[in-house]
A protein has these predicted regions:
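Transmembrane alpha-helical cores of Major Facilitator Superfamily
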Residues: 2-6, 119, 123, 157, ...
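A gly/Pro-rich, aromatic-decorated transmembrane alpha-helix motif that marks the paired
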Residues: 5-21, 164-168, 228-240
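Intracellular loop-helix junctions on the cytosolic face of multi-pass helical membrane proteins
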Residues: 9, 15-119, 127-144, 148, ...
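Hydrophobic core of transmembrane alpha-helices in multi-pass small-molecule transporters
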Residues: 166-197
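Intracellular juxtamembrane helix-capping segments at the cytosolic ends
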Residues: 195-210
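Conserved hydrophobic/amphipathic alpha-helical signal-anchor segments
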Residues: 243-280, 316-364, 411-412, 417-437, ...
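Acidic, glycine-anchored loop motifs typical of Ca2+
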Residues: 265, 283, 305-311, 315, ...
Length: 476
């Protein structure tokens, strides 16, 4: 287990760095080559490893015997609780990384990439395994008999403490603060302690408690708990997604701009495009209108909730002749802009600090949308906020919400960051977007003279469990 985590530490440090500076070819190619070498080394030992010959139907008889079924049932009950552990633990590669993007990642004199923080877990495993084996376990065993089940039980409670820690950190982020990454590393220490007590103990327990011919099956049951935990997390994340009304139009636009291998558009005539748009349905089951503009651009119109064109629920997406999205227009444009001005005025008057969610909501609550509901405000982090019209259904967090998302770019005082060479990712952005991409890269580095606000309009497309609420949900 220590050997596995030594490899995990090295790969978790190097892979994000290779991806950032040399691209996916090396970042994923090198691990692929190393896996091939590992397979070859394993093959070289084929004459030294112990080979257990298949026993035919004896395996079936023992597996489905009274003892075999009793063993699997007992372990399945234990592993069902362990599945909850994996539902939380494996989020270190997803929600924890996203949280790290909003934290101050300068730690130990190094500016860490968000994905590199995961390397803390395997290196802590290497340190903590001997500490637990030769220090903590013997001490606890003097207080009460420390059985494998008690180790697992204690580990599950410790996991709750670790996830509560990142929940608190996310609360700070939700309030516009930028906590140190050290807080998340502290949570990693708690999480790793839980892993030592749960994962290692379960691996040992599964092997020692299984009948000789069933060891692989019992190990598979343990690994099934990992899958179940991830299925649960995936199910929650799927359930909390709010449908995005703009997807139908943006997907249609990609089809309109599609070209064959010779660079010729597949839809070459106006009739072809009109036929396609009339057959394409939005999430409400309505067709999409296509209108050409004088300057060569075109507009795709979604009818919205009422299914009728020419009403306040219409959503207009304007695209350039080359297919670049220029604007999203809705009936809420004026209201959202008015609210945006109020939030920006507060920002300018309060030392470049955004209002917290409740303060911002109070600031714009007098602005009423076209359907009689006050606008809503949410602070996402210190550099992002959302202003929302509830839309025609008057319900928050639905596909009819019309949302202005604003992102703040701030000048950086660190001159070395501005002058360092472009990474592979930054060069790729510039290659794909040209001058616009270069501007995007410079802005992300803080190479601008003054604070800038970028805004985008979305219709739906949010998540109805976010921020600290998301982390507290899994904690409880």
């Amino acid at each position: 287990y220590i050997s596995i985590n030594v490899g995990a530490f090295i790969s978790t440090i190097l892979t994000p760095w290779l991806l950032e500076w040399y691209g996916p070819h090396l970042a994923f190619g090198i691990p692929g080559i190393l896996m091939a070498i590992a397979t070859y080394v394993f093959w070289l030992g084929r004459k030294k490893f112990i080979h257990i010959q298949p026993k035919g139907m004896g395996f079936i008889r023992e597996t489905f015997s009274r003892e075999g079924l009793r063993t699997m049932t007992k372990l399945a009950i234990i592993f069902s609780f362990v599945a909850v552990f994996w539902a939380l633990f494996d989020q270190t590669g997803s929600s924890w990384v996203l949280q790290a993007e909003d934290l101050n990642r300068n730690w130990l004199g190094v500016h860490w990439l968000p994905s590199q923080i995961q390397a803390i877990n395997p290196i802590m495993i290497v340190i903590m395994v001997p500490i637990f084996a030769f220090g903590i376990y013997p001490v606890l065993d003097k207080v009460f008999p420390l059985t494998p089940l008690r180790k697992v039980s204690i580990g599950l409670f410790v996991m709750v403490i670790g996830f509560a820690m990142v929940s608190v950190v996310q609360q700070w982020v939700d309030q516009g603060q930028q906590p140190s990454i050290g807080w998340q590393i502290f949570a990693y220490a708690i999480l790793t302690s839980s892993e030592v007590m749960v994962s290692i103990t379960c691996l040992e327990f599964a092997y020692t408690q299984a009948p000789r011919s069933m060891k692989s099956v019992i190990m598979a049951l343990f690994l099934m708990s990992v899958a179940l935990g991830n299925f649960f997390t995936a199910g929650v994340n799927s359930f909390i997604q709010v449908p995005n009304q703009l997807v139908a139009a943006t997907s249609l636009n990609m089809t309109i701009q599609a070209k064959d291998k010779n660079g010729k558009k597949l839809l070459s005539t106006q009739e072809d495009i009109l036929k396609l748009t009339s057959q394409t349905k939005d999430i409400n089951g309505n067709s999409i209108q296509y209108i050409t503009n004088q300057e060569g651009s075109y507009t795709l119109i979604l009818a919205g909730k009422d299914g009728t064109f020419g009403t306040t629920t219409d959503i207009r997406l304007k695209f350039s002749k080359g297919g670049k999205q220029i604007a999203v227009k809705t009936a809420e444009k004026t209201n959202l802009n008015t609210a945006f001005v109020k939030i920006k005025s507060y920002f300018d008057s309060n030392k470049n600090t955004l209002p917290k969610t409740q303060a911002g909501t109070d600031l714009i609550k007098s602005i009423i949308d076209n359907w009689g509901s006050p606008l809503q405000y949410r602070l996402v982090n210190r550099n992002m906020f959302r202003i929302t019209s509830l839309g025609a259904d008057k319900n928050y967090m639905t596909e009819n919400d019309i949302v202005l998302v604003s992102t703040i770019s701030r000048p950086s005082k660190d001159e070395s960051t501005k002058k360092k060479p472009y990474s592979w990712r930054e060069n790729r952005i510039i290659e794909l977007k040209g001058d616009e991409g270069k501007r995007e890269v410079v802005k992300s580095r803080g190479g601008i003279k003054e604070i800038e606000f970028d805004t985008a309009i979305m219709v739906g497309g949010q998540t109805n469990l976010e921020g600290s609420d998301y982390f507290w949900f899994f904690t409880w």
